[in-house]
Amino acid sequence: MEMVLFLVILTIAAFLLIELAYRMWSRRAKEKAGEAVPAMGITLPPVALPEFRLPGGFFYHSGHTWAHLTPSGEAQIGIDDFAQGVIGKIDRIDLPRPGTLLRQGEKAFSVVQGMKKIDFVSPVDGIVNAANDDVNADTGRIGKDPYQASWFLAVMPTNITQNIKKLRIAKDAANWLERELMVFLEFITLHRATPAEVGITMQDGGHCIEGVMEKIDGELLQLLVRKFFR
């Protein structure tokens, strides 16, 4: 039975990788031909992956955090749709106090689920002005929309001009997330995760992103964290 389940997940992952590769090739071909291609939003096969929200006006870090510049000059930061999908249920968010100095690419806050924890890096350098306590009062709101009102920290940037050079926006962000999904599927296949671990279910229309953190722990979880959230 375990061998059958393993073959099922390998087959699903193979088809998804082929589909994603075709989509990326098609996008590049259209760009070279001068055709318009959508810059935002990624719709993938509903059996396997959700449609990821990727709103415009946000700068995305490779560690799956984002920064949004406000009219006041602050940068609100939070986690992207990929991250909240992988985590699933969130019990609490450990946020730094106002006045804390953040560095781009270094730990900014932690998302906790039971005894598990993922440390997320800051997308920008800056000083914390405020922490959004509302997200801890209602962590479910992050799953509904990880952007806009679900920001975690308000930061006064100290090096935004240089920081932005290492972030992604618009079409660049959409292309990056497509590649990231391919890497994620390869990661699952490489480590031989079972359908029970990653939530792939052909019958109920599940997908291999949502709530992965709820289903794995130990070394596999640490490998996932190092691969996608640094």
Residue ranges and their predicted role:
Residues 1-230:
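Contiguous, well-folded functional domains in the mature portion of proteins
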